[in-house]
Amino acid sequence: MVYAIVKAGGRQEKVSVGDIVVVDRVGGEVGDTIELTPILLVDGDKVTNGKDLADVRVSAEIVRPEKGPKITILKFKNKTGYRKRQGHRQKLTRLKVTDIA
């Protein structure tokens, strides 16, 4: 089984061909192909890392942009009546790994 550890959206993800990964927002349109930065490649018993990864390419296709779950931020100060409520939804991108070469 071939898999790679790639850096995508500020995090490291373990991916193999056909996997769908959700990462922080990546620029591009739906259907575009992007290159992910490989950190480690495992092919059966053979492990590749460091300078040997210069030839390794991990390609992924942008499936769709989406948003994460809504979180609520509350601020409160005692005895003053100060209350502040704010929401946030992280922008994400769903990627499908198409090739590890």
From Swiss-Prot:
SUPFAM superfamilies: L21p-like (SSF141091). PANTHER family: 50S RIBOSOMAL PROTEIN L21, LARGE RIBOSOMAL SUBUNIT PROTEIN BL21M. Keywords: Ribonucleoprotein, Ribosomal protein, RNA-binding, rRNA-binding. The keyword rRNA-binding applies. Coiled coil: none annotated. GO terms for biological process: translation. Part of the 50S ribosomal subunit. Contacts protein L20. HAMAP family: Ribosomal_bL21. It comes from Beutenbergia cavernae (strain ATCC BAA-8 / DSM 12333 / CCUG 43141 / JCM 11478 / NBRC 16432 / NCIMB 13614 / HKI 0122). Belongs to the bacterial ribosomal protein bL21 family. The keyword Nucleotide-binding does not apply. One of its GO terms (cellular component) is ribosome. This is Large ribosomal subunit protein bL21. The lineage of its organism: Bacteria, Bacillati, Actinomycetota, Actinomycetes, Micrococcales. It comes from the Bacteria.
